[in-house]
């Protein structure tokens, strides 16, 4: 079974806009996949379907053996415990330190303090933040803030890491460092990575699988691909 298995999926919003149209897509465990396309093509809707922010109008969306389409709202937490999500906006809690931001989710899950410390320190080590654990978000750079977000996303060792424009607010040099870190996590932890991006240079340099959407339709799916999206619209 594929880790992500989407079949004949449609997402039509109440205003009649079709964001995803007859999408069939399979992603193996441990793959690194870029999702590309012009603004409004359905990229963000696709990843929202994966973490059940949206439900498909029609079709199947399976993530780690869970049928997202049939998942009751009260059971969404079971899916999200298998996921880590990194957004363009850092969404860090300003009054908490780096350590506390990464630990916050585990504390809410009722994880024992000794285990929290072990997991948090491991995540901070992976992301190169051990020297920043006592800092507050406003005391570190944008790139470091995004590293905190990545540490927070991987602290529970998720099977899937979803990155929605993770370099959108960063300069080119820092963007490359962040993607290099995500690639390292993919290789070392075996985490499946699905990354939405507009960054042509990063996509072209990575030579990973590239999926392109246009008006909600899959128009390209290439292993070791390059950025082919037409952003003229």
Specify the residue positions occupied by each region the protein language model found:
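Catalytic Walker B motif of ABC-type/P-loop ATPase nucleotide-binding domains
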Residues: 161-164
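Conserved ABC transporter NBD signature motif
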Residues: 59-67
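Conserved ABC ATPase signature
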Residues: 136-140, 144-146
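A short, proline-enriched helix->beta-strand linker immediately N-terminal to the Walker B motif
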Residues: 155-159
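Short coil-to-helix segment of the ABC ATPase nucleotide-binding domain corresponding to the Q-loop/switch region
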Residues: 96-104
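Helix-to-loop junction immediately C-terminal to a conserved catalytic motif
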Residues: 51
